[in-house]
């Protein structure tokens, strides 16, 4: 009797650990559903929109300029940020101050990316904290799930490109 109960208990614990490991690998390496909060990505992503983020791109260095990514915040590692990739390592970026009076250039160092929100007037991004390490990127967002009226692939940046050629 006791042997049967212990056997069932160990099987249950084993299955729980096994499924927990499978779920962890799925969310860590494949992707998952994310709710974006804040106005920094408007109009592309509104506050409380639900999107799908895939994580394979970050593992295989498939992040490109124009991609929207989820990353660990450089100023608060407990929170995530949702921003668009403006520059990759080695790029020269045209940066502006919030008032748009002063324009300058910044270089993205090796192993880093330059992230900005689509809503430039209401976004804390690389213009404030500089380029972020590639290792902080958690995944690439490419599909909006909710609201259903916006269901589908995400559109290009409303700000156009701001790369410097000189």
From Swiss-Prot:
Organism source for this protein? Homo sapiens (Human)
InterPro entries linked to this entry: LexA/Signal_pep-like_sf, Mito_IMP1_subunit, Pept_S26A_signal_pept_1, Peptidase_S26
Location comes to: Mitochondrion inner membrane
Lineage of the organism = Eukaryota, Metazoa, Chordata, Craniata, Vertebrata
**Organism superkingdom:** Eukaryota
**Entry protein name:** Mitochondrial inner membrane protease subunit 1
Tell me, in one coarse class, where this protein mainly resides.
mitochondrion
Report TM segments: none
Q: Might you give the EC number(s) for this enzyme? A: 3.4.21.-
| Active site per UniProt | 40, 83
Pfam families with a match to the protein in the record: Peptidase_S26
Q: Per the record's keyword annotation, is DNA-binding included, yes or no? A: no
Can you quote a single GO CC term?
Answer: mitochondrial inner membrane peptidase complex
Indicate the family of this protein: Belongs to the peptidase S26 family. IMP1 subfamily.
Which GO BP terms, alphabetically? protein processing involved in protein targeting to mitochondrion; signal peptide processing
Task: Return the PANTHER family for the record.
Answer: MITOCHONDRIAL INNER MEMBRANE PROTEASE SUBUNIT 1, PROTEASE FAMILY S26 MITOCHONDRIAL INNER MEMBRANE PROTEASE-RELATED
Q: Name one GO molecular function term.
A: serine-type endopeptidase activity
State the function annotated in the UniProt record: Catalyzes the removal of transit peptides required for the targeting of proteins from the mitochondrial matrix, across the inner membrane, into the inter-membrane space. Known to process the nuclear encoded protein DIABLO.
Query: Subunit comment for this entry?
Result: Heterodimer of 2 subunits, IMMPL1 and IMMPL2.
Keywords, ordered alphabetically: Hydrolase, Membrane, Mitochondrion, Mitochondrion inner membrane, Protease
Q: What broad class of enzyme is this?
A: hydrolase
